[in-house]
From Swiss-Prot:
Residue numbers on the Cytoplasmic membrane side: 1-13
Presence of keyword Glycoprotein: yes
Gene3D superfamilies named in the record: 3.90.550.50
Cross-referenced Pfam families: Galactosyl_T
Name this polypeptide is given: Lactosylceramide 1,3-N-acetyl-beta-D-glucosaminyltransferase B
Annotated localization: Golgi apparatus membrane
Organism: Danio rerio (Zebrafish)
Gene Ontology terms for molecular function: glycosyltransferase activity; lactosylceramide 1,3-N-acetyl-beta-D-glucosaminyltransferase activity
Amino acid sequence: MAVLKMPRFKKYHLRLMITCFSTLLLMTYWEKIDNCVVTHVMSFSYRYLFNSFKFINSSFIVNPEDAIKYNHRYLINHQTKCDNKDILLLLFVKSSSENFERRQAIRSTWGNETYIESTLGVTVKVLFALGLHPIPEERGKLKEDLMFEDQKYRDLIQQDFIDTFHNLTLKLLLQLGWKETYCHHAQFLMSADDDVFVHTPNLILYLQGFGQSNTRDLWIGGVHRGSPPNRDKESKYYVSRDLYPWLSYPDYTPGSGYVLSRDVVSRIYQASLTINASFHIDDVFLGICAKMMDVSPTDHAFFSGEGKAPHHHCIYSLMMTSHGHVSDIHEMWRHARNAEDVLISSGLFRRLYCTAVKVRLLCVPFFSNSYPCKAAFFEEDT
C-alpha cells in the first residue's frame, strides 16, 4: 500500500511547488503585470463604460493669478511672419536649441516653404518652437548660434522656459498662444517633433479636401483611447495618483504629429488658460483641454506616433507622418516627391496588390508597427 501512495504524494508535492512558484513569480512581477495588463483593462473599462471626465472642470482649474506663471517671455519672435498671407497651414516643429542639423534637414525637405508654394500651390508657414537649453554653460554657447541661424532663416520662436521633457506642456502653450496672437487666420495648425517626417504633398492634398476656410471641429492624428496613466516611477511618463488619480486619460493624439482646425485651436487655447499647466505630458494636456471644450479627435490610420513607416510605395502614397527619422529624411523626401511612389493608379489589380503588401507589412502579430493593421485597408478617399 505504501508503494501505491508514493506517486500520489509526489504528485501533490509537485502541485504545491508549482503553486508556490507561480505565486512567487506573480508577486515579483505584479507591478509590471499591473502596469501592462491590469491598468489597461481598468482604463478601457473606465473609458468605454463610464466615459466620465467631469472631474476636469473642478480638479484642473486654476485662477488667473496662478495661470500667469505659465506665460513666458519671447527671446526670439517674428510677429509679422503671417502678415498679409492666405495661409493654409501653420506648421510648428518642436525642436531643441542644439538640433541645428535636424532643422536644416527639415528646411531642405518637407518643411521647404518655397517648394510647397511653388509646387503645391499653397502657403504654409514653418516655425521651430524652442526653449532654453537646460545646461547654463551650453545655453550661453548656443545663444549666438541661434541668433545667427535666425537672422538667416527667420523661422525660430523661442521663449525663456527651460527646454526639458517635463516642460513640453509649456512648448505646447507657446504654439497655441503664438497661433492665436500672430497667425489666427491660418486655417490649420500642425504640431510635429523634429524627428518626424511629414509627407507634406499628401497632407496638403488632404487638408485641401476640407474646402476653403470654413472647416470646423477638426482634430486629426493617431488617436489614443482609454490610455492609462503610467504609474512606474522609473518612467519619464510617470504620473502620480496625487497629480492624476483617475484610471484613464481622455482621448488624445500623440505629440509627434497632429493637425487642428482654426476654431479648435482657439477653443483649446482658451481652455489652456484656465487649466493647471504643471501636468507635464503635453499631448495628454491637450486632450484634457479638448475634453473640457467638448472637442474629440478623429483617428487617421497614417499618422504615426510610434515608429518608422515601412519603405514601400504603397505606404508612401497614403503616409501623413512617420516617426523617428533623422539620417534618412532626404531619402524619405525623395520618395515623397516621386510620382511613382506617391500615386496609386486606378484599377482593381493595383488596389488589391497594395492591400496585400500593406497587410504583409502592417499586420504582423506581436510586432509594434508605425501604423495599425487597419491602415492596410485604408483608402485615399477615407
